[in-house]
């Protein structure tokens, strides 16, 4: 009897994940056709979306990572524009969410809510509210609202890191947020993990230093072999570039094995190179280790936070070079079913 109950509980807790590898910037691509992606997301019927942001707690606990200074710069500006004491932020956010639930077209309150989320170091949901205001202004000019947004959020000053400027041509503005709004979702869940960013950067620097010496020395002895490997890498990125310049469905291609292999070669070269004499294999394996650790952390965050939210079907949106790593990790997790966007018909 206990075994039956335990098995039933495990079955009930199964999590389904729709994983989408994306570009972080679609601005230089041809006009993109997202119709199939939208259709598949709607068909999947998710109850939550996860994006590549740090949670409030992680943002406060991680002392440094690639866009920490940018986030602190935004925080400083928005506090100068209008500060809200930290203890008042939860109540302010709840109150504004109540207003917006009653009056979805109150874009002044949405601007206030974006501001409060940013002050609360919840960049994911600050961006979601800012995007809705920005998108409204693109369709319905409103000088008073535009002035209010500029005074409160200073979007023209937020230009680096995961900024408001970057948001406008990102995977969130083009894929996640339109579908979240259509499906009536009010929250973007954070899943990023930056606990190992310093280790990652140190291992990257170690590889670069030793690879430069390896390339200089090896070119004399194994020049043809090394040139052949570099040709393979360069040919891959020519293919990548060709897709980005010509395809109306870049996202679908980014979720293919071909794209994953090419993308990985940019960070990790080719596995065939690792056993070449004097190749910095130990340093490269360390670099790969820290990349896997970040992806493992992201997957763990999805699992734990989906469970806490009571979500059983979730969309996970991550940069293209995360997609295969995360899918492999999710596939090894008990009670998890994962498909990438191309596998969902």
Task: Label the predicted regions.
Residues 30-37, 161:
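N-terminal post-signal-peptidase region of extra-cytosolic proteins
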Residues 27-30, 57-64, 198-201, 324-327:
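Extracytoplasmic/secreted cell-surface and envelope-processing proteins
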Residues 23-27, 160-167, 286-290:
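Second-shell loop/turn segments in exported
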Residues 72-140, 222-272:
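Low-complexity, serine/threonine/proline-enriched polar segments
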Residues 1-16:
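Bacterial Sec-dependent N-terminal signal peptides
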